């Protein structure tokens, strides 16, 4: 049912040690053969590459997995469920503008009923047919409603509220990024690996652990925010329902 990968660090790093095994989960070592995508940021600008072909067979993905160096990235391998066919417009990650920033989103799970929810305006209109992209647009609409002064506690609390509402419709693990902060929500299946050594401070997020090491599962319904490889906020899980700014 799709898999997620996210990365945040305090300096540019080559991501091959994680992206290479993640690529194999795109139809090779896991049943996610219906497309892949990688978003990364360079000098504040998002670059997005994706294809509807199986990731483990893709030469383009092999090059990206080997060569990509960045401080911030989101990747996805897809198992087509809703709609149950591959296609470029339905391949994650998705990118839309909100609050004068470009946001990138990828999702693991199924929340098909979200497609029927009414939207409040044209802020974000899906390009494809997936429940994932519809959910993304609803999240961005909520963020915009609380983003007037760009105070993180306000829009993050609104994001958490909408996340919990959408999660009642099914399974809703996701990664979201505005080019500065990596937001990860573990509804029921997400892991993190946090590292701080001579090579820098970094966090790797993945649906399943990709390497040996002290990977830790997210608590159920836990939302975390990372910046420069450091966790700066946490909601849900075993914490209070209001933002815990670290």
Which ranges hold each PLM region?
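Short, structured patches in soluble enzyme cores that scaffold and shape functional sites
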Residues: 6-9, 40-42, 76-78, 107-108, ...
């Amino acid at each position: 049912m799709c898999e997620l990968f996210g990365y945040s660090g305090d300096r540019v790093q080559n991501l091959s040690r994680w992206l290479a095994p993640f690529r194999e989960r795109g139809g090779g070592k896991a049943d996610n053969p219906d497309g892949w995508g990688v978003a990364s940021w360079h000098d504040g600008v998002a670059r997005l590459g994706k294809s509807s072909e199986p990731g483990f067979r893709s030469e383009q993905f092999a090059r990206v997995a080997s060569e990509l160096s960045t401080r911030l990235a989101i990747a996805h391998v897809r198992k087509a469920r809703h709609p149950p066919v591959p296609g470029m417009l339905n391949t994650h990650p998705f990118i839309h503008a909100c609050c004068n920033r470009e946001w990138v989103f990828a999702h693991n799970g199924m929340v098909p009923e979200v497609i029927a929810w009414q939207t409040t305006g044209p802020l974000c209109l899906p390009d494809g047919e997936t429940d994932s992209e519809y959910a993304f647009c609803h999240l961005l609409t909520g963020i915009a409603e609380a983003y007037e002064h760009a105070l993180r506690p306000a829009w993050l609390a609104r994001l958490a509220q909408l996340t919990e509402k959408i999660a009642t419709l099914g399974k809703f693990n996701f990664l979201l990024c505005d080019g500065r902060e990596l937001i990860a929500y573990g509804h029921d299946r997400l892991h993190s690996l946090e590292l701080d050594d001579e090579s820098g401070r970094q966090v790797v997020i993945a649906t399943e652990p990709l390497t040996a090491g002290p990977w830790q599962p997210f608590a159920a319904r836990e939302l975390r925010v990372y910046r420069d490889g450091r966790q700066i906020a946490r909601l849900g899980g075993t914490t209070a329902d209001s933002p815990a700014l670290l």
